[in-house]
């Protein structure tokens, strides 16, 4: 069953939908997206690919897609692995507040 729910709906932010069936977050036109794989029995979201077509680059879409993915991980108590180089090399250095969700083999405290 495909689940699609709007993540961002403010005028400044594009509408990003969670496509559960295809395991990705995507723009309304489905042309820009972040793909993920669930690991560790569904407890870890591995973000494996970010794509924005050349005609839409420079608009901040990749960042909006990543925020949607990290918000989803946070609200579902998932840790995140960043196999995608955009996420690890560009998004996280610019948005270090998300580092707390990164997967670690050490148990996390719930404090």
Would you name each region that the model predicts?
Residues 58-70:
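Conserved acetyl-CoA-binding loop-helix of GNAT-fold acetyltransferases
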Residues 88-90:
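Short secondary-structure capping/turn micro-motifs that flank functional sites
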Residues 66, 80-85:
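Catalytic nucleophile loop
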Residues 97-101:
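Short, hinge-like loop/turn segments at secondary-structure boundaries
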């Amino acid at each position: 069953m495909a689940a699609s729910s709007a993540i961002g709906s403010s005028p400044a932010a594009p509408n990003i939908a969670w496509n559960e069936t295809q395991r990705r977050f995507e723009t309304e036109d489905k042309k820009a997206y972040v793909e993920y794989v669930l690991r560790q029995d569904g407890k870890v979201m591995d973000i494996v690919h970010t794509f924005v077509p050349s005609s839409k680059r420079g608009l901040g879409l990749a960042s909006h897609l990543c925020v949607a993915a990290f918000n989803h991980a946070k609200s579902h108590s998932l840790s995140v692995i960043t196999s995608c180089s955009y996420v690890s090399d560009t998004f996280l250095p610019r948005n270090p507040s998300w580092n707390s969700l990164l997967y670690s083999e050490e148990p996390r405290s719930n404090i």
